[in-house]
Amino acid sequence: MPNLEELWAYLNDKFREELTPVGYSTWIQTAKPVKLTKDKLEIEVPASLHKAYWEKNLVTKVVEGVYEFAQLEVDPVIMTKDELQPAPATDQRPAVEEDDQNLTFKAKTHLNPKYTFDHFVIGKGNQMAHAAALAVAEAPGTTYNPLFIYGGVGLGKTHLMQAIGNLVLGNNPAANIKYVTSENFANDFINSIQTKQQEQFRQEYRNVDLLLVDDIQFFGDKEATQEEFFHTFNTLYENMKQIVLTSDRLPNEIPKLQERLVSRFNKGLSVDVTPPDLETRIAILRNKADAEDLSIPDDTLSYIAGQIESNVRDLEGALVRVQAFSTMKNEDITTSLAADALKALKLDDRSGQLTIPQILNAVAKYFQLTVQDLKGKKRVKQIVIPRQIAMYLAREMTDNSLPKIGQEIGGKDHTTVIHAHEKIMASMTTDENLKAQVIELRNILKNRG
């Protein structure tokens, strides 16, 4: 049995890398581990809002992290302090066979019941993705196969993916549904090789009615895993079984992804999700407040929504922080209280607020050009390289989709943005002057204002 403190430190490091500073301070730093047994990890959180968020967004990552660290399959149990009860002595059970521990591909795959279409707030940034996901859920395997949903962190890709699974299961309880992250798939494949059970692995993955694979971009540097997934994909596609994939970028932008996989991922429909606009952010907060029975004025919701522009996770994290601050001070939630609660997050400094026009202005000023030069069609070197740098910075420092970046930088095609990003990345490895310019511009943009 692994040391609980060491395991928790490992999970903390993973969350610190994957979450924004706002998310990490709100959800992870306020939680603490209570007990670890062979099949259960108890985690204490301060309030019911934290519990709901953990159960909706973080338990799957805990399961993956514990398996990576200790090769244990556990069910995370999230409890508030009031709910926490001493675990009965009968929780201690004999260790399972080593072979059984390795058969991760035989473990049940749990869809989060809270990820439904009813709980999804539709806005301009996700309405096409929502419509496509709903169409797939209502008639799996017949249209948009595969469905490829891409966009930044915390924008609802996993929610939509699991909503498809939950609706399919609701319509057909006998449906065989498999939800995994790309890391799960890779680990299962490796374990099947080590235990000489590749045939069982293939039976598990190639006989499903619906395969949901999250964060497919992590396949990029795994050649053998890509080979296995290629054959899995082909089998399911030929049998008209539905495949849904998510990624933080388009298929042809994933580094080291085989061309034949890119081609297959592009067979269906690719839809993006972008950061929610103000109206959608307010609706998300109202939906969350109503679900948690929180009394909060509309003007306060508007204030919070105006402070958090990055993603839904940070938005919900801000609401939880305000609710906790209200409880601690024993005061009603007001705009003034919300401002005090969010002050420590230094929201005015976060890079998530950076816009493409700000990048264009900074790049134009730096290279003594005009914004119109960058948006124009002139192909002289003195303009082309700054234009490519602007596209590179927009891709690296904002959550905007490739089509959005291209549109705002002179109506360019998304493939032009991909080329510019790759060109600047490659050039920085050999051109020290260019690298210094990009670093200096990054610092200017980070320290703007």
UniProtKB/Swiss-Prot annotation:
It comes from the Bacteria. Residues 72-109 are annotated as: Domain II. Its main location: cytoplasm. PROSITE patterns: DNAA. One of its GO terms (cellular component) is cytoplasm. SUPFAM superfamilies: P-loop containing nucleoside triphosphate hydrolases, TrpR-like. Keywords: ATP-binding, Cytoplasm, DNA replication, DNA-binding, Lipid-binding, Nucleotide-binding. Residues 327-449 are annotated as: Domain IV, binds dsDNA. One of its GO terms (biological process) is regulation of DNA replication. It is found in: Cytoplasm. Gene3D superfamilies: 1.10.1750.10, 1.10.8.60, 3.30.300.180, P-loop containing nucleotide triphosphate hydrolases (3.40.50.300). ATP binds at G154, G156, K157, T158. Residues 1-72 are annotated as: Domain I, interacts with DnaA modulators. Domain I is involved in oligomerization and binding regulators, domain II is flexibile and of varying length in different bacteria, domain III forms the AAA+ region, while domain IV binds dsDNA. Plays an essential role in the initiation and regulation of chromosomal replication. ATP-DnaA binds to the origin of replication (oriC) to initiate formation of the DNA replication initiation complex once per cell cycle. Binds the DnaA box (a 9 base pair repeat at the origin) and separates the double-stranded (ds)DNA. Forms a right-handed helical filament on oriC DNA; dsDNA binds to the exterior of the filament while single-stranded (ss)DNA is stabiized in the filament's interior. This is Chromosomal replication initiator protein DnaA. The gene is dnaA.
